[in-house]
Amino acid sequence: MIARPATIAFPSAPEILTDRLRLRMPVYGDFAHRQAFYADARSVWEGGPFTAEQAWRIFASEVGQWPLMGFGPFSMEDRASGEYLGEVGIYQPEGYPEPELGWFVTAGAEGRGIAAEGARAVMAWARASFGWDHIDNYIDPGNARSIALGLRLGGVIVQAPGADPTDVVIRHDLRGAA
């Protein structure tokens, strides 16, 4: 079991740079992108589509994990253009057995390796910051693309509790991530 940090070292997201991405603290202006995602049929794997009010509650509660837990979502933007590309991060709302590595990308960012690049950076950050030896994905069994990505990132399917009893749980060994 992964323990939550005893002290909150990161009340706000640090900036993480990769070859193509800038991972940063989400800001209010990012909500329009989240709202668009949650209104779209692509959000079905997260329980959507959602109304604007529901999307706001999800967005605000996820961003609120930073001061409460010391981790949360990062907004991903293109380093060259500043274009918003999606979100990647560590989530643990009430009821999740352990912190989860999750992601979503805008429709225009799909198929470009954006989620993978962001996820690798977050895994390395989690290992370096918290010393965790693993992190899981909790993925709806119908979400073949996210399952494939979790496996491409080096994760393995394990029999462990997820956020939902039907979730496919993919575990990533972080010991080589930092």
Task: List each model region and its residues.
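Acyl-donor (CoA/ACP) binding surface of acyl/acetyltransferases
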Residues: 1-46, 56, 60, 64, ...
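PAS/PAS-like sensory domain cap-loop motif
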Residues: 48-50
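Extracellular/periplasmic catalytic domains that process cell-envelope and extracellular macromolecules
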Residues: 67
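Beta-strand acidic-aromatic groove motif in beta-rich domains, primarily in extracellular
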Residues: 70
